């Protein structure tokens, strides 16, 4: 049985329109351990590269899912000995690095699962808005209200028996995150 994170990724992947190029960066085997002994292994900048050829937009996407009401993140000002959180320092910094390029949209995709009632809510947030939230909140976690307050955009989804289908065609065609260049 797949873990919920891989199942969310699989549902997200199945929701991508056929005319988009989607590439999953391969995780190293050490990426699945929680040990600090693997600090010298390759760390992917994000989970996916997605290209919308019709609009000429390249997305760098990091997907996160949780059953909790919040998502934790590591502080970028601290060294790598800090306790591990759901969003890692290198993921934040990598997405920030990609944001300097024209037509490149580095984003987080956040999925909140209410497992007791079988409902999921998913949002996409541009890294620039994430950084405003990061600096604006006086805590090392955020919830859905925080996300919405910092311009995260909800992705419409439908549950099909067990798995979700996310309407990414409509989402990508109607959102540009008002990226400042």
Regions found by a protein language model. Give the residues of each.
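Short beta-strand-loop-alpha-helix junction that forms the active-site gateway
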Residues: 63-85
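A structural signal for short, well-ordered beta-strand segments and their strand-loop junctions
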Residues: 24, 60, 107-110
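Conserved catalytic cores of phosphodiester-cleaving nucleases, focusing on short active-site segments
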Residues: 48-50, 57-68
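Helix-rich interaction surfaces within compact, conserved domain-sized segments
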Residues: 4-22, 125-181
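Short connector loops at helix/strand junctions that flank enzyme active sites
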Residues: 41-45, 56-60, 90, 101-103
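Nucleic-acid nuclease catalytic cores
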Residues: 93-131
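Short, solvent-exposed loop/turn segments at secondary-structure junctions
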Residues: 30-32, 68-72, 114-117
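Acidic-basic catalytic patches of nuclease active cores, encompassing PD-(D/E)XK
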Residues: 1-42, 53-54
């Amino acid at each position: 049985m797949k873990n919920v994170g891989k199942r969310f990724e699989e549902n997200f992947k199945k929701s991508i329109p056929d005319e988009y190029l989607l590439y999953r960066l391969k995780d190293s085997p050490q990426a699945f351990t929680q040990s600090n002994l693997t600090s010298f292994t390759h760390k992917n900048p994000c989970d996916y590269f997605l290209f919308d050829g019709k609009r000429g937009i390249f997305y760098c996407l990091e997907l996160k899912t949780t059953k909790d009401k919040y998502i934790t993140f590591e502080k970028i000002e601290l060294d790598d000995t800090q306790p591990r959180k759901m969003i890692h320092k290198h993921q934040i910094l990598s997405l920030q690095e990609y944001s300097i390029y024209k037509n490149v949209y580095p984003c987080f995709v956040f999925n909140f699962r209410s497992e007791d009632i079988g409902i999921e809510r998913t949002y996409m947030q541009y890294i620039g808005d994430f950084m405003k939230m990061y600096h604006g909140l006086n805590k090392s976690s955020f919830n859905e209200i925080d996300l919405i307050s910092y311009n995260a955009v909800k992705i419409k989804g439908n549950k099909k028996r067990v798995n979700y289908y996310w309407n990414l065609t409509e989402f990508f065609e109607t959102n540009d995150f008002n990226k400042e260049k």
